[in-house]
């Protein structure tokens, strides 16, 4: 039995429906009252934490947050009207030192909207995650240039508000992580880590974040990127195995072969340009070569590297190609996607 628990909102799933009913009755007996019984929803379509989760299609689950996006767009300022083909300009990471700082009211609005975008991208819209990752680094002192980048992301959402995330799992038992890093792209010359997890079709999880330390080469940036993702790489395998899922391989794909050698061989492949690295970044060597062998590292050409989507503001056909793979949609799919024709099945609803 799997229970997702967020404050007082629970999502429970199990093959045996009788056990689900038993759990619901016990929870109602423990926490429900005559005047305020628990609310129970059953069926193929559920509303949970602002998401619509649709299990209508066999072998797939679709996530959408159209209502959340509609509310966000209603809050958009007048100068954020219009649409855009991508969530970020190609110069996303460039900071203009001469740009005027936003006044307090506008800065608060910038922070508010960025927080909403962060909530959205971490649940269903990973296609805006790179843009949002940069915006979150600017909330403490945003300027007019940052505001324009926020507006660009809002305009893209307006053009694509009905896009959904659909996950389809295969039976290979293979977890595939696509990990990449963009070297020294931030104002302080720090690099940017990107990662995507797939278990069939669609991105189950994604990372796009500024690295916490400076590195001296693209190789060391890639190594730090893997270190950033490694806790999740290991935890995901252990979590799935605890759920009874047989994991046959836990693959980390990279496009930097020098970094791969360091990860596979540890200090034996370390030259004068990498000796300064803390030993913790070779923890992955133990995961690859140790007794448990919790992961393996494979090469992936840059043109096929999904993690690249999370490290830089891609444009045009490459952006659409990776977006389609991560959201599991067609590359030429229109921005307005039809919702499920099947109405929500709700066997029982009790209001608090």
Show where each model-derived region lies.
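Catalytic palm subdomain of template-directed nucleic-acid polymerases
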Residues: 1-32, 53-64, 137-144, 259-273
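Active-site palm subdomain of RNA-directed nucleic acid polymerases
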Residues: 1-26, 30-39, 120-131, 205, ...
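Mobile genetic element proteins and their domesticated derivatives, centered on retroelements
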Residues: 8, 27, 50, 69, ...
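Short acidic, Gly/Ser-rich segments with clustered Asp/Glu that frequently serve as metal-coordination loops
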Residues: 10-11, 181-189, 257-262
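C-terminal reverse transcriptase regions that engage the nucleic-acid substrate
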Residues: 42-162, 301, 311
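RNase H-like nuclease module associated with reverse transcription
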Residues: 138, 174, 212-352
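Structured nucleic-acid-interacting core domains from mobile-element enzymes and related host factors
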Residues: 155-181, 245-246
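RNase H-like nuclease fold core
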Residues: 174-221
């Amino acid at each position: 039995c799997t229970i997702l628990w967020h404050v007082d909102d629970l999502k429970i799933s199990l093959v045996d429906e009788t056990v689900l009913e038993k759990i619901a009755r016990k929870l109602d007996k423990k926490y429900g009252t005559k005047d305020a019984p628990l609310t129970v929803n059953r069926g193929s379509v559920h509303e949970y934490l602002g998401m619509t989760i649709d299990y209508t299609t066999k072998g797939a689950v679709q996530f959408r947050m159209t209502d959340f996006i509609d509310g966000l767009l209603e809050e958009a300022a007048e100068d954020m009207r219009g649409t855009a083909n991508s969530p970020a300009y190609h110069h996303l990471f460039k900071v203009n030192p001469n740009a005027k700082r936003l006044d307090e009211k506008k800065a608060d609005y910038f922070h508010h909207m960025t927080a909403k975008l962060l909530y959205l991208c971490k649940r269903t819209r990973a296609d805006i995650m790179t843009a949002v990752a940069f915006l979150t680094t600017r909330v403490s002192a945003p300027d007019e240039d940052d505001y324009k980048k926020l507006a660009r992301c809002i305009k893209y959402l307006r053009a694509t508000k009905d896009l959904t995330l659909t996950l389809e799992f295969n039976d290979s038992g293979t977890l595939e992580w696509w990990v990449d890093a963009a070297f020294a792209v931030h104002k302080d010359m720090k690099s940017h880590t990107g990662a995507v997890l797939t278990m069939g079709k669609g991105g189950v999880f994604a990372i796009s974040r500024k690295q916490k330390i400076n590195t001296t080469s693209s190789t060391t940036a890639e190594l730090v990127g893997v270190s950033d993702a490694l806790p999740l790489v290991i935890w995901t395998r252990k979590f799935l195995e605890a759920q009874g899922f047989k994991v046959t391989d836990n693959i980390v794909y990279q496009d930097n072969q020098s970094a791969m050698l360091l990860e596979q061989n540890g200090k034996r492949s370390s030259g004068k340009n990498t000796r300064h690295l803390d030993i913790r970044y070779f923890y992955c060597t133990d995961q690859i070569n140790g007794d448990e062998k919790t992961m393996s590292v494979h090469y992936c050409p840059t043109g096929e590297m999904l993690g690249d989507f999370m490290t830089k503001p891609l444009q045009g056909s490459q952006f659409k190609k990776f977006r389609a793979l991560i959201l599991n949609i067609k590359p030429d799919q229109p921005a307005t996607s039809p919702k499920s024709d099947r109405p929500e099945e709700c066997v029982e609803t009790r209001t608090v």
